[in-house]
Amino acid sequence: MYKEEYIEKANIPQNFKIYESRDGMFTDRIGPYFIKGRYPEVILGMRIFEHHSNLNGVAHGGLLMAFVDTIGGYVAAKAGESACVTANLNSYFMKPVPINSWIEGSGKALRTGKRAIFIRVEVMLNKSLVFAADGIWQKINREKGIPKS
């Protein structure tokens, strides 16, 4: 619904396709996100539109955090072979991201334990690091919605 009006405007680079979210309507509302490749070499991309901006006319920090949370969750689920939820996310804002920019993010599982996965996510704009995050994703039992013990 909402994302469809922006898909054509996104002018996506070659080899990206729409990312069909499995995490509910939230991602559909703030996107659209696009995906290229397969785990572990997957990249998510997004065009920054005016409605993604803050009062300074650049990408809102919360948007960037949601973007890396999606990437980290995707990587955690693949690396941990389990449904996961974000337990901790430390964010590092390096440079502002202007409206109409195309950003790309990728993540790497640094460590996979019995109950948690430690992930590093980086967001690039024109090959320049603009945002990064380190996080912990907790494995859960999707049916019960509780952490695995």
Region spans (language model):
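Terminal targeting signals and extreme-terminal segments of soluble enzymes
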Residues: 1-149
